[in-house]
Amino acid sequence: MITRKEFRKYATNERGITGTVVDDVVSHLYGPEMMTRTVIEERNMPFREVDVFSRLMADRIIFLGTEIDDYIANIIQAQLLFLESADAKKDIQIYINSPGGSVYAGLGIYDTMQYINPSVATICTGMAASMAAVLLCAGEKGKRTGLKHTRVMIHQPLGGARGQASDIEITAREIQKLKKELYDIIANHSGKTYEEVWANSDRDYWMIAHEAKEYGMIDEVLEKKKPA
């Protein structure tokens, strides 16, 4: 990433842009509100502004850093499909720091992860709770990791209903179906039995990184990045 001074020098000397205009642009690009969203990338000139998450996509990295809803799920599914079309043999990495969210939206991400050809590695960078924990353990076996102070939490699906008694019964049956699906998924990827997952998930079941490894939610705890 280039510095503000280097960018200004290039714009004025090489592109003939006046200093006033450059200063206005630079104040926008390097302002506090932009620091976490964009980077300035140099690739054989000219410089270009790139959304930081788009830049990570170029390295086949997807970031799930918010609650899971339909909007986020659609984006992640589209990113997975796009990266598969770009290279069906190269791994994809999903970094997860999420409290969970919609089970239906999360299952869409899960099914896409299992459907595409590239191996999907999952890395927890802070918290993977509820539906996010399901996605974490659903990564390629041997490629599921978490940082040292990662927290992983599993529990039974949450839901509610109102209206006529028959409608409430229908909703309750659907929640029970989702519960079984989620427990089957966790059991399949963690190596635990369905009964163990059912018992542990009756209430919020929190695990630190090493406990998540012992449980089978991840394969390795990352403490120091290995030099390239």
Identify the meaning behind each predicted range.
Residues 1-228:
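Terminal-region recognition feature
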